[in-house]
């Protein structure tokens, strides 16, 4: 999950705070989405890089489509 409050904020599948592409904004509906999860070997070096990139922005995705500590 990536969060950069400057241009866009992807807070999971239902939240895009920055509205970088407003035409692609998800509309709420009663339809349910199915998520298929798989199993793959652990890639420790990739995960460490992803985590360090997330903390470099200084914000994490919070509630109500906001990034903490900054609002998107």
Curated annotation (Swiss-Prot):
<dbReference type="GO" id="GO:0016151">
    <property type="term" value="F:nickel cation binding"/>
</dbReference>
<dbReference type="Pfam" id="PF01439">
    <property type="entry name" value="Metallothio_2"/>
</dbReference>
<protein>
    <recommendedName>
        <fullName>Metallothionein-like protein 1B</fullName>
    </recommendedName>
</protein>
<keyword id="KW-0480">Metal-thiolate cluster</keyword>
<dbReference type="GO" id="GO:0008270">
    <property type="term" value="F:zinc ion binding"/>
</dbReference>
<comment type="similarity">
    <text>Belongs to the metallothionein superfamily. Type 15 family.</text>
</comment>
<dbReference type="GO" id="GO:0046870">
    <property type="term" value="F:cadmium ion binding"/>
</dbReference>
<dbReference type="GO" id="GO:0005507">
    <property type="term" value="F:copper ion binding"/>
</dbReference>
<keyword id="KW-0479">Metal-binding</keyword>
<comment type="function">
    <text>Metallothioneins have a high content of cysteine residues that bind various heavy metals. Functions as a metal chelator of nickel (Ni), cadmium (Cd), zinc (Zn) and copper (Cu). Possesses higher affinity for Ni and Cd ions compared to Zn and Cu ions.</text>
</comment>
<dbReference type="InterPro" id="IPR000347">
    <property type="entry name" value="Metalthion_15p"/>
</dbReference>
């Amino acid at each position: 999950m990536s969060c950069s409050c400057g241009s866009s904020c992807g807070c999971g599948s239902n939240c895009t705070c920055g509205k970088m592409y407003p035409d692609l904004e998800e509309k709420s509906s009663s339809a349910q989405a199915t998520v298929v999860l798989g199993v793959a070997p652990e890639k420790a070096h990739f995960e460490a890089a992803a985590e360090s990139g997330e903390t470099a922005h200084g914000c994490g995705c919070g509630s109500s489509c906001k990034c903490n500590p900054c609002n998107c």
